[in-house]
Amino acid sequence: MMPEKRLSLVIATYNRGAKLCTTLDSLLVQTLPQEQWEVVVVNNNSTDDTAARFADYVVAHPQLDARMVLETEQGVSAARNRGIAESRGEYIVVIDDDERVVPEFLERYYSLFESHPEVGAAGGRILPGFESVPPRWMSKYTERTIAGTLDLGDRMREFPEGKFFGGGNHGYRRAVVGRYGGYDTSLGRTGGVLLA
């Protein structure tokens, strides 16, 4: 029998093996003890070397409890739903395959859900990072829209009605996902549609 994990980190990926490995690098220094969390990477039918890169990565970093599952239905919503279905944690945290997280990232989600049983879902800041200078078309408005940056500050508060979490950096209790059925696959990022 597999040991129980309290928190599952779900990462959907499609043809971004190099970026995924950079994301995984940021998980190696998490302050939450490794026995409390797992990583479920969902390969959304990649056609490049993403699966091979991931396999090499987990061999090189056996301390990371990470596995990859395949989702052939294209779209981030279908991929995230598969990751949730394959996960074991009571708390489910979602990030994108190009995000880097701070060392306290998972510990903060874990502590929030453990100490506030009334909280069913939570989200946090996403600060864009660029490999070079930001593209010229990137304004503060497009940065907020594309990166999902909605900064409500450092203290916990109820999420404003009519607002929604950005692409990555949000988490749920498994019971909440079960109650509402996961992500709507008719909205996922496929082709020209940008909602998940």
Stretch-by-stretch model annotation:
Residues 71-87:
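Glycine-rich, basic loop-to-helix element that forms the pyrophosphate-binding segment
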Residues 92:
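Short aromatic/hydrophobic "clamp" motif used to bind/position activated sugar donors
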Residues 1-29:
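N-proximal low-complexity "stem/linker" segments adjacent to membrane-targeting elements
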Residues 142-162:
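Short, flexible, basic/aromatic active-site loop/helix in glycosyltransferases
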Residues 18-21, 48-57, 104:
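Acidic helix N-cap motif at the loop->helix transition within catalytic regions
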Residues 26, 43-52, 99:
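A conserved acidic beta->alpha catalytic loop
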Residues 15, 27, 44-45, 74:
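Conserved short acidic donor-positioning loop in nucleotide-sugar-dependent glycosyltransferases
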Residues 104-138:
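Conserved donor NDP-sugar-binding/catalytic core segment of glycosyltransferases
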